[in-house]
Curated annotation (Swiss-Prot):
Protein name as catalogued: EEF1A lysine methyltransferase 1
Natural source organism: Mus musculus (Mouse)
One GO CC annotation: cytoplasm
Location of this chain's protein in the cell: Cytoplasm
BP terms from Gene Ontology: peptidyl-lysine methylation
Chief place where the protein resides: cytoplasm
Listed Pfam families: N6-adenineMlase (PF10237)
Alphabetized HAMAP family for the sequence: Methyltr_EFM5
EC number(s) recorded for this UniProt protein: 2.1.1.-
Keyword Hydrolase: no
Length: 214
């Protein structure tokens, strides 16, 4: 990870960071979920060195429901660097929806053929089975709060989507997100399971339920 990338990682509050460091010092991370449990949000522990910060249960549920509504019946959904949303979608057992997780962390390969290894530094290096403009909705949460990361992730988003985009990133990225993807900030404010010092927001390029009251 470069020094600039380190600066762009969403920041934990000092109290949360201390607790998280203590947690990692005391426990080994292991991935051995089975059955339906493997779709529980948080079953795979955050690795904050990879800038992983999972959504709260309520936020993951709200975003998953929005994704289902936006994609429509039988819709195809791509979750780009947004594993919490993928897990909640699969936890909801919507078998009529096709959902894929695009993720750098190979621990998520437990999800079989729905896992697509993804490195935002190579935004278009995707398997041949992933066709251009083959997803009704792309949900994306770029790992770093930088123009470079958002720009490269945007290339992936534009390749994958048939039109609809749901982006989750820092409030400070609003202008760049609008320029790159034509998205607007929603009223809904996402929350993470661990408190972040950065303000996060959701953005869409369509009329979404995230502008309505919960």
């Amino acid at each position: 990870m470069s020094e600039s990338e380190d600066d762009d990682i969403p920041q934990l509050s000092s109290h949360t960071l201390a607790a998280l460091q203590e947690f990692y010092a005391e426990q080994k991370q292991s991935v051995n979920p089975r059955g339906d449990d493997k779709y529980n949000v948080g079953v795979i522990e955050e690795n904050w060195q990879l800038s992983q910060f999972w959504y709260s249960q309520d936020t993951a549920l709200r975003l998953a429901r929005e994704a289902i509504d936006a994609a429509g019946e039988g819709g195809r959904i791509a979750c780009v660097s947004a594993p919490s949303v993928y897990q909640k979608l699969r936890e909801l057992c919507r078998e009529d929806s096709s959902v894929y997780i695009f993720e750098y962390d190979r621990r998520f390969a437990i999800y079989g053929d729905e896992f697509i290894f993804y490195d935002y530094n190579h935004p278009l290096e995707l398997p041949e089975r992933i066709a251009a403009h083959s997803f009704d909705l792309v949900v994306a949460d770029p790992p770093y709060l930088s123009e470079e990361c958002l720009r490269k992730t945007s290339e992936t988003i534009q390749f994958l989507t048939r039109g609809k985009i749901l982006l989750c990133t820092g409030a400070i990225m609003e202008e760049q997100a609008a320029q790159l993807l034509g998205v607007k900030m929603c009223k809904f404010i996402p929350e993470h399971s661990r408190n972040l010092a950065n303000e996060f927001r959701c953005y869409t390029n369509y009329d979404s339920g995230l502008d309505c009251e919960a």
